[in-house]
């Protein structure tokens, strides 16, 4: 279940799994952690974008997740793409840095994370698409079809920034 309250910008994603996303919701719980995360826009040679359907909130997304101790940003990005999709990529650019304190994700263990994600561009190297415990579907999607996919606004913003071919990374 998800949606916006009529006439408002509040966005809340509720799923039958362990995560609730809040965006611009005054009733959202207060963040108690910030976890550095990466997300990656990986286009193929036809400019289609690699998307996954997340198992934790059922929404479509670009691959990504939290960094692990000892990892560089590049290593975390490559690992997340490979783990969630089966695709190998090389990191070639920066879309932006996203740190909206009005976007939090509440987990059933009591953790409430404030968004902090570095969104990168990945060049497809190889591999075959496959699902994982974090992705129930994996596919390359033409940019013209992306508006028809249920994507959280924070992820849609990143995809749009990539598609705009911005000359400077987004910082916000």
Regions found by a protein language model. Name each.
Residues 44-87:
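Conserved Nudix-box catalytic region and its N-terminal flanking loop in Nudix hydrolases
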Residues 88-97:
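A short coil-to-beta-strand element that immediately follows conserved catalytic motifs
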Residues 42, 119-123, 140:
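Short, well-ordered beta-strand micro-motif
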Residues 100-128:
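Active-site-adjacent beta-strand/loop module that shapes the phosphate/pyrophosphate-binding cleft
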Residues 6-39, 110:
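Acidic, metal-coordinating catalytic segment for phosphate/diphosphate chemistry
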Residues 35, 55-57, 62, 89, ...:
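Short connector loops at helix/strand junctions that flank enzyme active sites
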Residues 3-10, 58-59, 128-172:
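Nudix hydrolase/Nudix homology domain
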């Amino acid at each position: 279940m998800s949606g916006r309250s009529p006439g408002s910008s509040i966005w809340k994603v509720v799923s039958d799994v362990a995560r609730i996303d809040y965006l611009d919701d005054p009733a959202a719980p207060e963040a108690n952690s910030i976890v550095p995360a990466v997300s990656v826009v990986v286009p193929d040679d036809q400019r289609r974008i690699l998307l996954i359907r997340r198992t934790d909130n059922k929404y479509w997304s670009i691959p990504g997740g939290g960094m692990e101790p000892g990892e560089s940003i590049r290593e975390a990005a490559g690992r997340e793409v490979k783990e969630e999709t089966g695709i190998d990529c090389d990191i070639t650019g920066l879309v932006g840095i996203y740190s909206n304190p009005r976007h939090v994700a509440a987990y059933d263990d009591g953790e409430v994370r404030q968004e902090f994600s570095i969104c990168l561009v990945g060049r497809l190297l190889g591999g075959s698409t496959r699902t994982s415990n974090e992705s129930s579907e994996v596919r390359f999607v033409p940019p013209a079809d992306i508006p028809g996919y249920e994507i959280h606004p924070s992820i849609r913003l990143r995809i749009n920034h990539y598609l705009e071919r911005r000359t400077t990374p987004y910082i916000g």
